Structure formats: structure tokens, C-alpha cells
């Protein structure tokens, strides 16, 4: 077994959910299920015991040694127009690392698991990281009632897969875990610009996501004076700029990712505007005040137009730090391979941020060509994928060998 196997597996997995030049493998879709079935066969072919837990997480277990397991993982669900590396490198790279240790004849002192967590992306049902939330024992009951654009609920899809929504709490397994490592593409330009081969993650930013509704008044686009309008889109514009200024001032990011306008006609002033908001920040102190900041900023921005504001917070995950000991182990593994490395934060959310508060956790990044992700143009060079597997395997061997 060689590290190059991960690139072969990435190409195979990309065939599930092919959509033109992109990958569309939404959580709980048929393409997602077919991909998990293929992955289960890969796990079993590598000598792992594969099983789908009550939350839809697929886990391959190398039942060796004793004590708590070291878990390597990420996700294989995707957004609507995705590339082939986001999440999948962490799962297939984890499998490749296990196969490297097996080929070397390593006999682990602890069990090793490879996990593909359910619905990390959250794009279909509007809430992310269901699988890792259930895995660590969070109450995910509210998630089950969420519906996609076609009106299908998570609970309905679970039943279609042969899973019982009432048993989702049985997916909790964190008490059996001693450490977690996640290999991932950077999804940004820092490593490539710096000419570095790997990034050792020091922490993951906190994230608040919300759905915002602004209500004004529909009226004639030609006969209503500008100073007599309650235009919901004008409120959106003011709010977007104000949120951007607040994010820049705090070293964070604010993104309005989707917008819906009613009634949506050339000749009618918009009566309603709904939009999604994603606000991220690295400081815990700043994060703790983020909900109030969003409320205050949006409401103040909409006052000049006399708009009614409704804000529903859909997700809130605080920033987390990575485990210093495993971070150092990853650095040593990179150094043994002669790889250039740098410490860096993660601006993206990952399953690791749910697991880090419970067990020692670390993440390893490899470069993203052009810093592009969540796009068919997403690309990580094959040699960087292979190097990531080698560094991961080196750290894993140090932890369990």
C-alpha cells in the first residue's frame, strides 16, 4: 500500500453524485447512500469492521489493542456544486493512513476508527454537522424536523435509509474515543502563497448562522417617492454593509449566502426580504457577544426604512483550540518527512470543532490550488494529498504504535 492510493479513491468517490464538472452529493441523497455503500466496502476490504450508526455516520473500526480509540475522520457529503476534496480527503486519507500502518506491520496499542460523519455541510436542511453532534451526545431532536426545499424532513430521509429517528441518541460514542485527527484541504490561499506544504491547525473559529427576515411594504415602483418607501431590499443593503464593517473591525467574516425577495416583480417595491447570515470570529470573548451584535446591527440598519426584523439563530458553535500535544506530534511527523509546515487557524468549520471540547483533537491542512473550495474548480495537487496521508500516518503511529 502506498500514499498514492488516496488519489485513486478520491477519483472513484467523485463518481457518486457527478453533476457536470461538479460533485452534488447532498446529505441523505441517493448519491450519498451509494457513496457510503462503496466506502463501507473499502473499509471492509482494508480489514476494518464497517457499520452505519443511528445518525448515519459510517465508521470503520480497526479493533486492535485496548482502551479508547483514536479516530480519523471527516465527511463525504457535499454542497450543490462542489469539488472532490472537501471532507473526502479526511475520510479517504484516514483510511490510507490506516492501510500504511497495516502494511508496515504496526500493531496498535489502541483501536483505530475511520469515520465519515453525516451532513457536515448542512446545505440541504439548513443546519450543519448532524453526525458529529450526535456522535458527541448533543441533543439533535430539533434537527430531525427540518425540511429541505422539497418539503422532505430529515426524519423522513432517515426512515427511507432504514434508520429510526427515535434512536439517533444511540449514536453517542465519544466516551469510547481517546483522540481525534482530521486531515483536510485548507480551503484558502495561505499555504500556497507561503509555499508551505502542510498546515498544522491551532484552532477553529467560532460560527453563528442565522436566517433573517425583513418586512416592509409593497407599493408601486414608479409612483411611490423614495422618501415614502419601506423597501425590504434597501434594508438588506444597509444591513449587509453594516455587518461587513463589524466583521472587518473584529478580524472576522460575515457572509450573506442566500437572498429571497417578495413579491419579486420589476414594478413592485419589495415587501419582504429573507437572507441567510454566516458570521465567524476567532476570539471567544467576541463570539460570546456575537448574537447581540447581529441583532443590534441588523435592527439599527433597518430603522431608516421602518422595517420589521425577525432573526432566527440556526447554529452557534464557539471557537475551539486544538490539543497542543497532538499538534506537536503532527509537526514532528512533518519534520521527519522533510515537509515545510506552518501553524495556522482554520476559518472554516469542521467536525473537529464539535469533537475538540470532549477529547484531544488536531487538524492537518494541505494546500488548496488558488485557495478555491466549494466549487468544481477545487483542487489539491496529488502529491500534497499523498504528503498529508504520510504526515497523518506518522502522527497516528506515534499515538498508537
Each model region followed by its residue ranges:
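Catalytic-core environment of secreted peptidases
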Residues: 46, 54, 58-89
Amino acid at each position: 500500500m502506498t500514499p498514492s492510493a488516496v488519489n485513486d479513491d478520491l477519483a472513484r468517490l467523485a463518481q457518486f453524485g457527478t453533476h457536470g464538472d461538479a460533485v452534488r452529493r447532498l446529505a441523505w441523497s441517493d448519491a450519498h447512500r451509494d457513496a457510503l455503500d462503496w466506502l463501507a466496502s473499502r473499509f471492509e476490504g482494508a480489514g476494518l469492521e464497517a457499520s452505519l450508526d443511528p445518525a448515519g455516520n459510517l465508521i470503520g473500526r480497526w479493533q486492535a489493542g485496548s482502551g479508547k480509540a483514536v479516530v480519523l475522520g471527516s465527511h463525504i457529503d457535499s454542497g450543490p456544486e462542489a469539488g472532490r476534496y472537501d471532507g473526502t480527503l479526511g475520510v479517504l486519507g484516514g483510511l490510507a493512513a490506516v492501510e500504511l500502518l497495516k502494511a508496515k506491520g504496526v500493531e496498535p496499542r489502541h483501536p483505530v476508527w475511520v469515520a465519515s460523519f453525516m451532513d457536515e455541510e448542512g446545505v440541504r436542511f439548513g443546519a450543519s454537522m448532524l453526525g458529529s453532534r450526535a456522535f458527541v451526545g448533543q441533543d439533535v431532536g430539533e434537527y430531525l424536523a427540518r425540511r429541505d426545499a422539497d418539503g422532505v424532513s430529515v426524519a423522513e430521509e432517515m426512515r427511507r435509509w432504514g434508520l429510526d429517528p427515535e434512536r439517533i441518541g444511540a449514536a453517542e460514542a465519544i466516551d469510547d474515543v481517546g483522540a481525534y485527527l482530521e486531515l483536510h484541504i485548507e480551503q484558502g490561499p495561505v499555504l500556497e502563497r507561503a509555499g508551505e506544504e502542510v498546515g498544522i491547525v491551532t484552532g477553529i473559529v467560532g460560527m453563528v448562522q442565522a436566517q433573517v427576515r425583513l418586512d416592509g411594504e409593497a407599493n408601486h415602483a414608479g409612483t411611490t417617492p423614495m422618501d415614502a418607501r419601506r423597501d425590504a431590499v434597501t434594508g438588506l443593503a444597509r444591513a449587509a454593509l453594516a455587518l461587513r464593517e463589524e466583521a472587518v473591525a473584529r478580524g472576522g467574516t460575515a457572509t450573506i449566502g442566500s437572498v429571497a425577495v417578495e413579491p419579486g416583480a420589476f414594478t413592485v417595491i419589495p415587501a419582504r426580504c429573507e437572507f441567510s447570515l454566516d458570521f465567524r470570529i476567532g476570539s471567544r470573548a467576541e463570539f460570546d457577544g456575537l448574537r447581540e451584535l447581529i441583532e443590534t446591527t441588523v435592527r439599527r440598519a433597518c430603522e431608516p426604512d421602518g422595517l420589521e426584523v425577525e432573526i432566527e439563530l440556526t447554529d452557534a458553535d464557539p471557537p475551539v483550540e486544538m490539543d497542543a500535544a497532538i499538534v506537536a506530534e503532527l509537526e514532528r511527523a512533518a519534520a521527519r518527512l522533510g515537509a515545510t509546515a506552518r501553524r495556522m487557524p482554520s476559518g472554516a468549520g469542521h467536525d473537529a470543532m464539535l469533537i475538540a471540547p470532549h477529547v484531544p483533537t488536531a487538524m492537518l491542512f494541505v494546500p488548496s490550488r488558488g485557495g478555491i473550495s466549494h466549487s468544481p474548480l477545487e483542487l489539491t495537487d496529488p502529491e500534497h494529498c499523498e504528503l498529508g496521508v504520510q504526515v497523518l500516518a506518522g502522527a497516528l503511529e506515534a499515538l498508537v504504535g
